[in-house]
Amino acid sequence: AKTNIFVFAIYFLLSMGCHAQNIATSELNGTKWKLVSPVSDYCERGMSFTMTTRTTTAKFKKNKKEFQFPLKYYLSSSIPQTFDSSQIGKNRKGSYIIQYVDNSVFWFKIVDISSTKITLLSKLGDTTVYQKVK
């Protein structure tokens, strides 16, 4: 009986680690998010989505200057080897936001999403939490 509990415990931990949220492009379309973790003292960060573009924003508190970084994206259920631009703008379901950065695939895993919050894990290992603005 002890072995069963041990196996179950390991299975439970593994399933937690692999758990990701599936979402459709149409559900992200038109949404706007504000970064709530990690928070910066000098800069407000956010992101917004259209069907084709994920735009990250940085607004500096001191001089109120805002910078926008729009990048094409698509959703995928796994991490692709190459960026498939034919998938941009299609209403796909997936737990990964796939982008093309510096000639290679960059991804964010959607760890959790609710009507008010989204948690992303990046290819670099950073976890960010955003609160929904609209």
Per-range role (PLM):
Residues G30-M47:
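Start-of-domain marker
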Residues G125-V133:
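Short, low-complexity, Pro/Ser/Thr/Gly-rich segments in the mature regions of secreted, periplasmic
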Residues V7-S15:
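Bacterial N-terminal signal peptides
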Residues Q21, V133-K134:
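Short, solvent-exposed mixed-charge patches
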Residues P38-C43, T57-S115:
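Contiguous, well-ordered beta-strand patches that form the walls/edges
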Residues T52, S114-I118:
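Ser/Thr- and Asn-enriched, surface-exposed coil loops between beta-strands
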Residues H19-K32:
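N-terminal helix-cap/turn-to-beta initiation motif at the start of protein domains
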Residues A1-F6:
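Bacterial N-terminal signal peptides that target proteins for export
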